[in-house]
From Swiss-Prot:
Positions of region (Disordered): 1-22
Function comment: Essential cell division protein.
GO cellular component labels: cell division site; plasma membrane
Gene of this entry: ftsL
Keyword hit for Oxidoreductase: no
Keywords annotated in UniProt: Cell cycle, Cell division, Cell membrane, Membrane, Transmembrane, Transmembrane helix
Annotated protein name in UniProt: Cell division protein FtsL
Residues on Extracellular side: 59-120
Similarity comment: Belongs to the FtsL family.
Pfam families named among the record's database cross-references: DivIC
Bilayer topology term: Single-pass type II membrane protein
Ranges of Basic and acidic residues composition bias in the record: 13-22
Predominant localisation class: membrane
Length: 120
């Protein structure tokens, strides 16, 4: 029996321990610091100012485009009116028409008093 006691002394008690892994320290974030709040506020203000500026520029562009379209429409109407008036001037300035009206008014055609004017 003495052998049994001797053997137990030779082999120390083996305790099975799990390998301990170092615990990862989880950082808990508290409230934001004053510096972070200032930076976020400034960044947000810049974003809002840029967004407002973009919207206002787009509104100005829209207004200018509307004015341009209105002016172009007026120009086209005026050009059409000018063309109609040119046709009317040519029609009213015909030699036969002028001669007819002159005869109705009692005027006579005298070749010595006629001057030829080069029209445009």
């Amino acid at each position: 029996m003495s052998n049994v006691a001797y053997k137990s002394n030779l082999e120390p008690n083996r305790v099975h321990r799990e390998a301990e892994q170092p615990k990862k320290q989880i950082l808990k974030r508290g409230q934001m610091t004053l510096g972070e709040k200032v930076i976020i506020t400034i960044a947000l203000a810049i974003v809002l100012v840029v967004a407002f500026r973009i919207i206002s520029v787009q509104a100005q562009i829209y207004t200018v485009n509307q004015e341009i379209q209105t002016k172009e429409t007026k120009i086209l109407e005026q050009q059409k009116s000018n063309e109609d008036l040119k046709v009317e001037v040519k029609d009213l300035g015909r030699y036969e028409r002028i001669l007819k009206i002159a005869k109705e008014k009692g005027l006579k055609l005298d070749g010595d008093n006629v001057k030829v004017v080069d029209g445009q």
